[in-house]
Amino acid sequence: MQNTTLHIRHLGQQDYESVWHAMQHYTDTRNNDSPDELWIVEHPPVFTQGQAGKSEHILNPGDIPVIQVDRGGQVTYHGPGQLVVYPLLDIKRSKIGVRQLVTYIEQSIIDMLAKYTINAYAKADAPGVYVDERKVASLGLRIRKGCSFHGLALNVDMDLAPFRRINPCGYAGLEMVQCRELGGPQTVIEAGDQLIITLSQLLGYQHLVHHQGLAAS
């Protein structure tokens, strides 16, 4: 049965590992009655290497830490000025397939950017969202016990230079772009507020409940 309520957790800026472990804990301990949640966060500079990641795609990390994680995909960069959204959803309960969830996430970003007259699109062979062949958003999910965690990263107003220290998502020379350059949302808060609307609508949630910070464990 579809759960029509989505809980939104606004986490502010939090270090990557603590949020990652909190996602794992929430997913491992949830049951059939646990609410679906969307976590909105920014991370300090960090490279994360997905399960398909190859070390040769990390060219010159320098002083930015590299963390091996349990999501799909290859290496990406997180940093201040980037909107990170983690959908912690019981997709088995909602009867949403993994591919369908990826499509919904990509489409929510496309729909949000369309409000700013930005023509963004997805690619069948390279998950994420693009504008004029430049990547504005990256995706990497994990499904455990029929529930999703990890999620999406949307470049809003950030230093894109660290992306040049890696082959983003395993693609050498892939050019990144951000919302500020495109005339899109200018802040992470603005982008998050808009993306919550488009994503919750596509996923079929009718009620949104907002929280500051993580629930006490």
Curated annotation (Swiss-Prot):
Q: Which residues bind substrate?
A: 71-78, 138-140, 151-153
Q: What is its EC number?
A: 2.3.1.181
Site (described: Lowers pKa of active site Cys): 135
Give the location in the cell.
Cytoplasm
Gene3D superfamilies (alphabetical):
Bira Bifunctional Protein, Domain 2
- Which key words are in the record? Acyltransferase, Cytoplasm, Transferase
UniProt KW Transferase keyword: yes
Q: Which Pfam families match?
A: LplA-B_cat
Under which pathway is this protein filed? Protein modification; protein lipoylation via endogenous pathway; protein N(6)-(lipoyl)lysine from octanoyl-[acyl-carrier-protein]: step 1/2
Q: Name one GO cellular component term.
A: cytoplasm
Uppermost EC category: transferase
The record's InterPro entries line, in alphabetical order, gives: aa-tRNA-synth_II/BPL/LPL, BPL_LPL_catalytic, Octanoyltransferase, Octanoyltransferase_CS
Catalysis performed (reactions): octanoyl-[ACP] + L-lysyl-[protein] = N(6)-octanoyl-L-lysyl-[protein] + holo-[ACP] + H(+)
Q: What does this protein do?
A: Catalyzes the transfer of endogenously produced octanoic acid from octanoyl-acyl-carrier-protein onto the lipoyl domains of lipoate-dependent enzymes. Lipoyl-ACP can also act as a substrate although octanoyl-ACP is likely to be the physiological substrate.
Other facts noted in the record for this chain:
In the reaction, the free carboxyl group of octanoic acid is attached via an amide linkage to the epsilon-amino group of a specific lysine residue of lipoyl domains of lipoate-dependent enzymes.
Instruction: Tell me which family the UniProt entry assigns to this protein.
Output: Belongs to the LipB family.
Its protein name is Octanoyltransferase
What is the originating organism of this protein?
Answer: Shewanella oneidensis (strain ATCC 700550 / JCM 31522 / CIP 106686 / LMG 19005 / NCIMB 14063 / MR-1)
Q: What is the lineage of its organism?
A: Bacteria, Pseudomonadati, Pseudomonadota, Gammaproteobacteria, Alteromonadales
